[in-house]
Amino acid sequence: MIKKIYNQIRSSLPQKYQIELSKFVFRITDKPFFVNDENYDLKKGIVVVSADFELAWAWRYSKKKINISEIAERERNNFHIIINRLNELDIPITWATVGHLFLDSCKRENGKAHWDMYRPNYFENEYWKYKYGDWFDIDPCGNYKSDPGFYAPDLIEIILNSKTNHEIACHSFSHCDFSERNSYSKLIDAELSECRKSMDKFGIRPVSFVFPGNLYGSFDHLKKAGFKIIRYKANDSKELGYPEILKNGLMAIHDSIALDVYEDGWDNNYLLWKYKKYIDKAIDKKAICHFWFHPSLQYKQLEEYFLPILNYIHSQRENGKLEVLTMEQLITL
């Protein structure tokens, strides 16, 4: 209730004052908020990092005016910088990957891309508006060389061949809304099945799932499909803490905060300071901090706080203060 009122007040302000309000609240409260669980007794803090690896797929029905080709190109460029730094520092992360990226190519049949796949019904949510055409209209039905924003087997190979043991998780096949409001059983089952099928040729059997747009739902379908852990928090105020076991047996790990910021006006030095606070408190409480991000973040953000926060994670681990784990590795805690 308090958070809802806060969000209503914040959204009514000009953007400059929204940012100042966020800074003020962070300063006067005990943020980042920690929720304890006596079932866990960790020896040190843990940092988990998950990447929503999507290229053009996440943005095609965005309500914002976005050049999806530009975003996909930036993500490809950033990918090499990010993976090189992760491997240099030996920081494993979870790459939550859209299933279509595993394809070398695809083609139209019966006049449609992926004609045998179930489609979402028209819908509108907080982020996307899909009101006309076919869900796969944007699919170029080419290949990773002609249309690198829609296919990425070359990048998948780089992840798999890294000296650091990264995890590849499922992020659906086509980045659709998994909420009960905007999906249906056959659609969800098809999205999960097709994503697994696209991963098969790489020998990947994912156990972790990240919801597209962080739009939660279809938990029983995920359990039935063999997933073991999801990025999800039932307690919206929890920023640091421990995994939860849902009623159907799925493990859920909260996300703490996103490492990419879309509001203009933030000072990147402030953001670096803020992200360090999350790590420091996770160390102090011997809890889990779970960062997530889009690899398409702006290059200035990448340089000024994203890569520096990776360096900070590395230094704190080298000092024996924390561990770095993937989502999959949390299952055995």
Where are these regions (language model features)?
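Catalytic alpha-helical scaffold of carbohydrate-active enzymes acting on polysaccharides/glycoconjugates
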Residues: I2-S208, G213-M251, Y270-F291, Q298-L333
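C-terminal amphipathic alpha-helical segment
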Residues: D255-K277
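Short strand-loop junctions, especially beta-strand C-caps/beta-turns
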Residues: S256, H294-S296
